[in-house]
Amino acid sequence: MLALRCGPRLLGLLSGPRSAPLLLSTTRTCSDGGARGANSSSQNPLVYLDVGADGQPLGRVVLELKADVVPKTAENFRALCTGEKGFGYKGSTFHRVIPAFMCQAGDFTNHNGTGGKSIYGSRFPDENFTLKHVGPGVLSMANAGPNTNGSQFFICTIKTDWLDGKHVVFGHVKEGMDVVKKIESFGSKSGKTSKKIVITDCGQLS
């Protein structure tokens, strides 16, 4: 499941905040991007994920990738969104969703949290831990321990500062946090989703 450390099967993310532990645990596409905030760079890529649940559209999530801080990690995610390497996120699922924590996706090989791969090979090292898990909408890499980044990622729905220094933050939601909340509503304490949540399309906006 997630890369929040739990051994070789990418089962991490089973532990919640210290103060409140969890019980369970392609081409590029042009469209309107989100408004850029003061902490955004006009040079950073904007990508999108179109998401559905049991075949019904939920909407679009637009993400800014912080290429100005973590260029290698941002490029991995960007290319997996466009599918330009011949593989990527389109058709994969949000396989693990824990309300009041995070929504995890990116395993496009096994679809259960045990697979996925990066554009650099199976895994690549932690780039840096400059960006922090400061609140809802943070985009971060899942892993199975240090230097095991692949394609799995998660979007936080709360501040998750206990993950700082363990997971590489590389972006944030620019538009569509309401869609993230819809995804979150189909989750459970175990992470199992009540509906099949699929990335029906994805790509790059700018």
UniProtKB/Swiss-Prot annotation:
GO biological process, one term: regulation of apoptotic process
PROSITE patterns from the UniProt entry: CSA_PPIASE_1 (PS00170), CSA_PPIASE_2 (PS50072)
Domain PPIase cyclophilin-type as annotated: residue spans: 48-204
N6-acetyllysine modification, residue list: 66, 166
A GO CC annotation given for this chain: mitochondrial inner membrane
Enzyme class name: isomerase
Keywords recorded for this protein, A-Z: Acetylation, Apoptosis, Isomerase, Mitochondrion, Necrosis, Rotamase, S-nitrosylation, Transit peptide
UniProt EC number: 5.2.1.8
InterPro entries noted in UniProt: Cyclophilin-like_dom_sf, Cyclophilin-type_PPIase_CS, Cyclophilin-type_PPIase_dom
Biological role: PPIase that catalyzes the cis-trans isomerization of proline imidic peptide bonds in oligopeptides and may therefore assist protein folding. Involved in regulation of the mitochondrial permeability transition pore (mPTP). It is proposed that its association with the mPTP is masking a binding site for inhibiting inorganic phosphate (Pi) and promotes the open probability of the mPTP leading to apoptosis or necrosis; the requirement of the PPIase activity for this function is debated. In cooperation with mitochondrial p53/TP53 is involved in activating oxidative stress-induced necrosis.
Residue stretch of the organelle transit peptide: 1-29
Name of the molecule in the record: Peptidyl-prolyl cis-trans isomerase F, mitochondrial
Modifications the protein undergoes after translation, according to the UniProt entry: Acetylated at Lys-166; deacetylated at Lys-166 by SIRT3.
Activity regulation (UniProt): Binds cyclosporin A (CsA). Is displaced by CsA from the mPTP leading to a lower open probability of the mPTP.
Subunit structure: Associates with the mitochondrial membrane ATP synthase F(1)F(0) ATP synthase; the association is increased by inorganic phosphate (Pi) and decreased by cyclosporin A (CsA). Interacts with ATP5F1B; ATP5PD and ATP5PO. Interacts with SLC25A3; the interaction is impaired by CsA. Interacts with BCL2; the interaction is impaired by CsA. Interacts with TP53; the association implicates preferentially tetrameric TP53, is induced by oxidative stress and is impaired by CsA. Interacts with C1QBP. Interacts with MCUR1.
Originating organism: Rattus norvegicus (Rat)
Localization in the cell: Mitochondrion matrix
Catalysed reactions, semicolon-separated: [protein]-peptidylproline (omega=180) = [protein]-peptidylproline (omega=0)
Molecular function terms, GO-annotated: cyclosporin A binding; peptide binding; peptidyl-prolyl cis-trans isomerase activity
Family under the similarity heading: Belongs to the cyclophilin-type PPIase family.
N6-succinyllysine: residues bearing it: 66, 85, 174, 189
Listed Pfam families: Pro_isomerase (PF00160)
Modified residues (S-nitrosocysteine): 202
